[in-house]
């Protein structure tokens, strides 16, 4: 399940970057 946790964090950080830029 470590892969899922990393994948979730990746999308979370990516989404945060998009929302933070706007």
Curated annotation (Swiss-Prot):
Pfam families: PSMalpha (PF17063)
UniProt KW Zinc keyword: no
Keyword Magnesium set for record: no
Induction trigger: Up-regulated by agr.
Residue positions where N-formylmethionine is found in the record: 1
Gene Ontology biological process terms, A to Z: killing of cells of another organism
Highest taxon of the lineage: Bacteria
UniProt keywords, alphabetically: Cytolysis, Formylation, Virulence
Other noteworthy facts: Peptide production is higher in most prevalent community-associated MRSA strains than in hospital-associated MRSA strains.
Function: Peptide which can recruit, activate and subsequently lyse human neutrophils, thus eliminating the main cellular defense against infection. Stimulates the secretion of the chemotactic factor interleukin-8 (IL-8). Showed the most pronounced pro-inflammatory and cytolytic activities in the host, thus contributing greatly to virulence and possibly to the development of disease.
Family, as annotated: Belongs to the phenol-soluble modulin alpha peptides family.
NCBIfam families found in the cross-reference section: PSM_alpha_3
Name assigned to this protein: Phenol-soluble modulin alpha 3 peptide
């Amino acid at each position: 399940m470590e892969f899922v946790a990393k994948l979730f964090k990746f999308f979370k950080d990516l989404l945060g970057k998009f929302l933070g830029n706007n």
